[in-house]
Curated annotation (Swiss-Prot):
Residues 66-279 form the START domain. CDD domains: START_STARD1-like. Residues 1-61 form a transit peptide. Keywords: Lipid transport, Lipid-binding, Mitochondrion, Steroidogenesis, Transit peptide, Transport. Gene3D superfamilies: 3.30.530.20. It catalyses: cholesterol(in) = cholesterol(out). This is Steroidogenic acute regulatory protein, mitochondrial. Its main location: mitochondrion. Pathway: Steroid metabolism; cholesterol metabolism. Signal peptide: none annotated. SMART domains: START (SM00234). May interact with TSPO.
Length: 287
């Protein structure tokens, strides 16, 4: 989206495999190794939650038995995006404050080797996490209706219940500082217990080559994490990790300002969307 929604490095090559047993073994070894690395002496509460639920990052391998080579690759890419995102979010050191809004919304950033500059939005939303998940995942293609930073989101392909490939076109920026961008992304959506995840990274898809007049940008890993507030389960602690390469000759100072402000704007647009949804439900006639 630009914001929300999530995109990451296109043109990444992945080794395809037809051996599902090998895929299961390799994926689980890598995932558990990563989670062990995340476990420092004082792991954050949500990482501890992830470790307790070992099924968080594991795909339902039995659902993949009928997948072809390309579908298996997309599932694997989505899992990798989630794994990398959790690793980044689990490291609390080295973050620099970019924005602190009057309502407490905060954007932080840090520079990572082989990834570049990443941004992290941290907000508290007056919505239950399952409602937010339903809007961002279940109504994903409607995002352009309420987020002016997004012109269109289209699901190109679904693989099982947790993986999809999407095409997103960004909306105009003030003063057209950044021209039209689009993204092709693989997304991994998971709900485990009370915690919801939406991770993604750039990929390629045969039905969506680069479009004339639009710069194909890259993103990833990106991830939204939604979990109930410890103080009030009707509120959600919302974290959004954003990593984007907009391509083109754009000064870094402008990119940093655009991306951090995009995250703050997204939080406000999402609040308004959820408020509008609540009003619509209240006004709906009883059956």
């Amino acid at each position: 989206m630009l914001p929300a929604t999530f995109k990451l490095c296109a043109g990444i090559s992945y080794r395809h495999t037809r051996n599902m047993t090998g895929l299961r073994k390799n994926a689980m070894v890598a995932i558990h190794h990563e989670l062990n690395m995340l476990a420092g002496p004082n792991p954050s509460s949500w990482i501890s939650h992830v470790r307790r639920r070992s099924s968080l990052l594991s795909s339902r391998i039995e659902e993949e038995q009928g997948y072809n080579e390309a579908e298996v690759s997309y599932v694997k890419q989505g899992e990798e995006a989630l794994q990398k995102s959790i690793s980044i979010l689990g490291d609390q050191d080295g973050w620099t404050t970019e924005i602190i809004a009057a309502n407490g919304d905060k954007v932080l950033s840090k520079v990572l080797p082989d990834v570049g500059k990443v941004f992290k939005l941290e907000v508290l939303l007056d919505q239950r996490s399952d409602n937010l998940y339903g809007e961002l995942v279940g109504n994903m293609e409607q995002m352009g209706d309420w987020n002016p930073n997004v012109k269109e989101v289209k699901i190109l392909q679904k693989i099982g219940q947790e993986t999809m490939v999407t095409h997103e076109v960004s909306g105009p920026t003030p003063g057209n500082v950044v021209g039209p961008r689009d993204f092709v992304s693989v997304r991994c959506a998971k709900r485990r217990g009370s915690t919801c995840f939406l991770a993604g990274m750039s990929t390629q898809h045969p039905t969506m080559p680069e479009q004339r007049g639009v710069v194909r940008a890259e993103n990833g890993p990106t991830c939204i994490v939604m979990r109930p507030s410890a103080d009030d389960p009707n509120k959600t602690k919302f974290t959004w990790l954003l990593s984007i390469d907009l391509k083109g000759w754009i000064p870094k100072t402008i990119i940093n300002k655009v991306l951090s402000q995009t995250q703050v704007d997204f939080a406000n647009h999402l609040r308004q969307r959820m408020a509008d949804n609540s009003v619509s439900k209240e006004m709906a006639p009883a059956c």
